[in-house]
Amino acid sequence: LETLQQADVVVSEDTRKTGFLLNHFEIKKPQISFREDNEQRVLPKLMEELNSGRNIALVTDAGTPAISDPGFILVRAALAENIPVTAVPGPTALIMAVILSGLPVHSFTFRGFGPRKHGPRKRWLAIDVASPHTLIFYESPHRLIAFLEDALEVYGDRQAAVANDLTKKFETVLRGSLSELLAQFKENPPLGEYSVVIAGAGEKDLDNSDEED
């Protein structure tokens, strides 16, 4: 709250959502929308604000700014011009999802959102097919089933978890094999944004070696 109160401008994807937050805490600040479809047009204006000495608070609609978020473009541009940037720690879906998944958390890879079409998505997933690290993805509700189908085809029937509405009233984490999770979502259509956590390659072999030790 102190950061928002001290900022000269508040930047977010959806100023309506951020407006609810600001109004709730009676913080009156000018807002600028910075989205994937306007970032190249709005970025020069934001850089002008920063170069004039004004402070910008970057807020995300959900999660953490710059992670699977257009705010990354602004952060990179500011750093390129030696403008100081700091971050306010807060919850992020990928960390909560991997912790609650029940899968190994000592080493993991975050992939974020993948391609929308089957062919490119399967090739993108295949990049990590031999990786021993737990894999974390983000996916939208209307592509989740297709994503799980492609993941099952590429990775085989690995253990996985699908998390939704983390930190909210109806927080849900489903755990099981990819085929089991796929069946659940085919029966109960997905709603909301999802974090998908998939076991890395060779987890069973690692478990067996631990038992022998």
Where do the protein language model's features map onto the residues?
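A contiguous loop/helix-start segment that scaffolds small-molecule binding in enzyme catalytic cores
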Residues: R54, H133-D213
